[in-house]
Structure formats: C-alpha cells, structure tokens
Amino acid sequence: MANQIDEAKPISDLEIMRHSAAHIMAEAVLSMFPEAKLGIGPAIDTGFYYDFDLPRTLTPEDLPEIETRMNQLVKANLPFRREEMSKDEARKLFADQPYKLELLDDIPDEIVSVYRQGNLCDLCRGPHVNYTSKVKAFKLLSIAGAYWRGDEKRPMLQRIYGAAFLDKASLAEYLNMLEESAKRDHRKLGKELELFSLHQEIGGGLVNWLPNGAIVRHLIEEFWKKEHLKRGYSLVYTPHIAKVDLWKTSGHWGFYRENMYSPMDIDGEEYVLKPMNCVYHILMFKNRTRSYKELPIRMAELGTVYRYERSGVLHGLSRVRGFTQDDAHIFCLYEQLEKEVVKVLDLAKFMIDTFGFTRYKVMLSTRPEKYVGELDKWEYATDILAKALESNQIAYQVDPGEGVFYGPKIDIKFEDALGRAWQGPTIQVDFQLPERFDVSVVGEDGKDQPVAMVHRTVLGSMERFMSCLTEQYGGAFPVWLSPKQVMLIPIADRHSEFAEKLACELREEEVRVEVDNRSETMNQKIRQAQLAKIPYMLVVGDKEIETQSVSIRTRSGSQCVMPFAEFKSMLIDKIKTKSTEI
C-alpha cells in the first residue's frame, strides 16, 4: 500500500498531511509520465517520498517541474475520497500497475481501500487530508535509487524525497537546517580535512583512517581508556574471528545470522568474523574459577566487529561494515545490577557531556518478538533498568519491542548542534548468555551462584561517533581534539627561527604545532589554516620578536596580541580541561 499504518498507533495531523503530499506528488509525476508505474509513498520523519518506475532517469532539473504541478493540484482544492472494494475489483483497477498488484497479494483482507484525488487512484489505508489545499508547505529535495521492497534482486526504482510541514515558517527553518547540514556533512569534511577515506578496491563500508582522523580517534580512545581504568574496568583484547559453534552456543547464529558474514573454512573447521565482543569476554571470565567476592568484574575493549549492511544503506562513517565498538561487559551478582547500571549511566553522561553534547533522549527498549529466556527474568531485567534511570532522575520513554534477543536495553540518543538525533550509549541487562555459557561463581555457601551480565557502550562505535562529532562541530573540533592545534606563520624568512623556537616550546608541552615556511603570502597562509580549521594561527614578525609576543588569529576570525608565555598557559589549560571553547 502507499502507506501501511499500524491502526493502534495515533496518527498526527502532520503525518497525515505528509502522506497526502506523497499522493499529490504521485499525481504530478503521472501527469508528466502517464506510463509511470507506482511503488509506495509513505510519510517519513520530515516529509515524504514516493517510488516510481519511469521510462527515463530523472535529474534534479525535473524537480521544479514536478513541484510546479504539485502546486497546481494544491490550488485546485481537489477532494481526497476513500473507497472500499473487493480485491478482485482492485486487481482490475490496478491491472497496469504491477507493484500495486504485488501489494494487493500481500493483504490478507478481502476488502481493501483506495484513495482518489484528481486523476490519481492509489491503493491506501489512509487517512488523508480532506482537500489538496491543506498541503501548504512542501519542497522536493532529492532523487535516489531504491530497490523495490528493499531487495537488491528486485527492480531499482526512482525515489523522490520531499519535505513537508504544517506552515511555511517551519519548512523554511527545516530547509535552513538542511543547508547547514550539507556544509557539516562528515563525508564532505572527511575529504576536505583528510580525516578518512573509502575505496572500492577495499570494499564498501570499510574505512581507512587518515593521519588527521587517526589522531582524533587516538585522543578519543586514550581519554576513553583513562576514564575506564579510573572506574575499575580492566582493558582486554580479543580476536577478530571465532568458530561458528561459538555463535551457535550464544544464539547469535540463530537470531543474528542475517547480520553476520559467511563462514570461512580453516583447516576443515568453519570460522566467522565476529559481530560482537560479548562471547569472548564471557570465555575470559570463565578462564578460571571465581568467587562471588571478586564481583563485579568489568571488562572493556575497543573491539572491531563486522556486520553485514546492504550497499544501499552504507553512509560514510555512520553506516559501515567494519567498526570499532567502545564495548564493555560487567559480570555481577543480581543484587549488584542496579548499582552497576547507575554507574554506567554516570559514565555515559560524563563522556557525552565532555564532548559537548548536552541534550539527549533516553529510551527503555523492551522485549522483542524473537527472544530467548524466561518472561520473569525479562521483567526483572527491565525493572532494574527502569529503577536505575529513576534513581538518576533521568526522564525516559518506553520503546516497546526494541530490545535485543537476550535482554532489554537503555538507548541514549544525543542531539547535535542542529537538533538531529544520533545513537549514543546503550546499556543491556542479560541473564540469557550467562546461562547459555554456564557462567557462575562460587557463592558464600560454597555452591555455584548464577551471574548477571551488563553489555554497554558509552560512545557507540568510533566510526559513528566520529561522524557525529565532525558534524556537531562542522570539522572545527575542540582544541584538545584538533589534529593540528597551532600554526605558526612567520611574516618573512628572518622570522622563521623565532617561529621554530616557539614551536619547540609548544611541542615540549605535547601541543600539535607546525610552522608554515612556504613562500606564500601571509594572508594565503592564514586562509589555508582557517580552511583546515586549525584553532590558532600565530603570526610573528619583528614586533613579536622584540616583545616576545604573538599576534593571534583564531579560526573564527577574531584577533589579539598576547605575550607568548600567556598564550601557552591559556592553550595548555584549554587542552587539559578539554574545553569546547576557543
């Protein structure tokens, strides 16, 4: 159907209007291409899209014409009319629309509904606005390829995306945000700032970290390790592959296989790239007999995992096939669970606050349709997570059915500078994997005592977090994370020696500094350093040598003169405190 709807879920006026905009666009496209075959056209978070099978490839130049025709349909004030009919009648109606016929075959009911407006008749549950004139603020944005029903073996259709809002002011605000988003796109900045690269010779979704990106990642990882060691975690490392039988025991082979890569044969045994680190940590825990007095035990790893993603959904650093999770697993007694989850929440808040994310949304994701284990343990685990959130006075929403197959979880999504949500920390309580691997400790009575397990990340993955961080700051990272923190610019050759002397003093404090001795003009050097988003440019000439000062220009364009010793002290303080301000 044009938009399959869960009838139990209330539908907002905005969602209804966006869905109607998709139908109006479909009629506009049909008026341009009468032979068009229609796919689906749902409302989405910020607007709508519709998929078409067309006689030619669309170009961006087609969008204004489609939009003009849409505006004509809106002004015509055409009514939306709902009709019900039998599936046989609908098959006759859509005889020349093969995609609609396929959708019809999947509908279990014998009576279906269609919506008509103007010259369009579409298979749809609705609801819709009463008249086309109710769709007042929309803009067509882009064209993309989309496989029919997301299946790469099916035809490739052309998808037109549009934005739609209840009023023109909201639309204008959104379009401004899109314009700013394009400037901050981590794929664009990643290339301009030489942060990372992707190569088809290597394969889609497999990332090369270039020197500038590698130093940012290194700084994040060192900070992560230091904070975990302070909080009682032990750092571990695990292999990238394991025998298939290990994943069968864990349940991943049965519940998660579609996200795993095909097995490889090694000496007659099947191995597979790991999709997760948890099972390795379990085996480490079981490496010897343990007493209940040793708990909790916290293992942390920056572990690279591999998960299958269709080529069509790969996106820079944010959707990849190989990525490094900031992973940790806590083994504890049942009565220690709530306290441990509270500690993880404290750590997660500290980490994301440090990186400058101050707004976030918290979801409590509950038992999915496919799950393992007993219902009472699921309820207990869910209750533990809820209590931990409430004891921290953290507001949250319940996200039904979005837990993982072995346990419920807390998902924290933080907002960037443009108000966009990014996946951040996750915290999962798990009783199932410890049972599957027979994990226990020697209790106070000398008998085996079961152990609970907490899976958690505080950043998510290094790749996705780097994409978010890049877009949050538009590539202008906080000073402590900037690949190059200072560029010294001598006005003339005779000033180079002084510039090199200052650079040496800064390097002794582990400041990342360079001297630009190229035969370019000073203004060109400053401009290039600004484009590279280096926080500080220090210009030195005769006056600066005489006064032992520096003329400071920041990447934002502000200027001042300061004694070098004062600047060095200020810079070191900003780095040590991880300030997000220049």
From Swiss-Prot:
Span list, region Catalytic: 185-478
Any one of the GO BP annotations: threonyl-tRNA aminoacylation
Ligand binding (Zn(2+)): C278, H329, H455
CC annotations in GO: cytoplasm
InterPro entries: aa-tRNA-synt_IIb, aa-tRNA-synth_II, aa-tRNA-synth_II/BPL/LPL, Anticodon-bd, Anticodon-bd_dom_sf, Thr-tRNA-ligase_IIa, Thr/Ala-tRNA-synth_IIc_edit, ThrRS_anticodon
Reported cofactor(s): Zn(2+)
Cofactor note: Binds 1 zinc ion per subunit.
Signal peptide: none
Catalytic reaction list: tRNA(Thr) + L-threonine + ATP = L-threonyl-tRNA(Thr) + AMP + diphosphate + H(+)
Pfam families referenced in this protein's UniProt entry, alphabetically: HGTP_anticodon (PF03129), tRNA-synt_2b (PF00587), tRNA_SAD (PF07973)
Entry EC number(s): 6.1.1.3
Keyword terms, alphabetized: Aminoacyl-tRNA synthetase, ATP-binding, Cytoplasm, Ligase, Metal-binding, Nucleotide-binding, Protein biosynthesis, RNA-binding, tRNA-binding, Zinc
One MF annotation (Gene Ontology) recorded for this entry: ATP binding
Intracellular or extracellular location(s): Cytoplasm
Function description: Catalyzes the attachment of threonine to tRNA(Thr) in a two-step reaction: L-threonine is first activated by ATP to form Thr-AMP and then transferred to the acceptor end of tRNA(Thr). Also edits incorrectly charged L-seryl-tRNA(Thr).
Complex and partners: Homodimer.
HAMAP family: Thr_tRNA_synth
Xref: PANTHER family: THREONINE--TRNA LIGASE, CHLOROPLASTIC_MITOCHONDRIAL 2, THREONINE-TRNA LIGASE
Family statement drawn from the similarity comment of this UniProt entry: Belongs to the class-II aminoacyl-tRNA synthetase family.
Stated name of the protein: Threonine--tRNA ligase
Organism this protein belongs to: Dehalococcoides mccartyi (strain ATCC BAA-2266 / KCTC 15142 / 195) (Dehalococcoides ethenogenes (strain 195))
Upper taxonomic lineage: Bacteria, Bacillati, Chloroflexota, Dehalococcoidia, Dehalococcoidales
Recorded name of the encoding gene: thrS
